[in-house]
Amino acid sequence: MSGRVGDLSPKQAETLAKFRENVQDVLPALPNPDDYFLLRWLRARNFDLQKSEALLRKYMEFRKTMDIDHILDWQPPEVIQKYMPGGLCGYDRDGCPVWYDIIGPLDPKGLLFSVTKQDLLKTKMRDCERILHECDLQTERLGKKIETIVMIFDCEGLGLKHFWKPLVEVYQEFFGLLEENYPETLKFMLIVKATKLFPVGYNLMKPFLSEDTRRKIIVLGNNWKEGLLKLISPEELPAQFGGTLTDPDGNPKCLTKINYGGEIPKSMYVRDQVKTQYEHSVQINRGSSHQVEYEILFPGCVLRWQFSSDGADIGFGVFLKTKMGERQRAGEMTDVLPSQRYNAHMVPEDGNLTCSEAGVYVLRFDNTYSFVHAKKVSFTVEVLLPDEGMQKYDKELTPV
């Protein structure tokens, strides 16, 4: 049995009744204490009564902390309203709302230099409440319960800038909050125009997604427009995505409903860096260098680094070793990212590199040009692996 209203086994029905009894003290404070709502929490924990109750009570604390009862009255900062991509637009063939996330135009540094992480998370929670409100309106319009949504992630333009660690951490926290506080609301998450970096991005988010959510993620291949039309009628799908829906002025992107973001003007910045905790620190003597090696076992991995120096600039470059088992000088290795000097004492430096081949990559901090000063360098380096199951993303969409 699916565990949904009208499709409960006798044991599930008994568990639901017991669950309602156990949480009767919080029922008046719930947004909608009907069986549909309570069953979401039970399904999220496989009808484990104790775990479901703990999850629901934690959700009630979340509502208080985030002031969810009034979040729709809250207005996000101007920067977010203008430049945070995404929006509600249309419905699938069953009447479920469709939310679009437009990844490419997202300006990671611009956002986090202009607003706080809490502003971003609060905006995302506000979006969730907007979507649930739309589900309630659809329930009234159609005369049947609408409790799930379709999400479309447009990954065109997904690039290394989107793997900036502070932004990744915001999205990881967001997906964690979604799983804990909005369980069983996702019908499908459809990925379109996935780039070669998508498997890396998916692997970063996967630990924060439940098994149930992962099963609902479908990556559409080259025929993604046809795939979307299997779920969404042409008149409900923006022309930009293969349908016939446009703005009143004929714009195929439906800009009145979907924000496409863009680069944020530096005049809107309120800070020029995000505080970073580094994993390593090293003192590099004058006239010397420090090398850090990372073995990359297969192409497509991403090297991601952040570093800062104390008091003066530092050279930095990335190389590929030509001989294994011994230290090589820079001139003996293959240049991958040519060494140059960075003012990392003024602004922390960060970067990414997609490894096009397997081998041992060397990140080299260069102080050979300094004949007077030693340099202290603090750094964090990570190897981001692509998800093996997502490396071949040519699934055909089969509506369930």
Swiss-Prot record:
Domain CRAL-TRIO residues, every copy: 76-249
**Which cellular component, as a GO term, is one annotated location?**
cytoplasm
Q: Which PROSITE patterns match?
A: CRAL_TRIO, GOLD
| Keywords attached to this entry | Lipid-binding, Transport
InterPro entries (alphabetical): CRAL-TRIO_dom, CRAL-TRIO_dom_sf, CRAL/TRIO_N_dom, CRAL/TRIO_N_dom_sf, GOLD_dom, GOLD_dom_sf, SEC14/CRAL-TRIO_domain
Start and end residues of each GOLD domain:
275-383
Q: Name one GO molecular function term.
A: lipid binding
Q: Which domain of life is it from?
A: Eukaryota
The name on file for this protein is SEC14-like protein 3
Return the SMART domains for the record. Answer: CRAL_TRIO_N, SEC14
> Is Amino-acid biosynthesis among the key words of this record?
no
According to its UniProt entry, the function of this protein is described as:
Probable hydrophobic ligand-binding protein; may play a role in the transport of hydrophobic ligands like tocopherol, squalene and phospholipids.
The gene name reads: SEC14L3
**Lineage of source species:** Eukaryota, Metazoa, Chordata, Craniata, Vertebrata
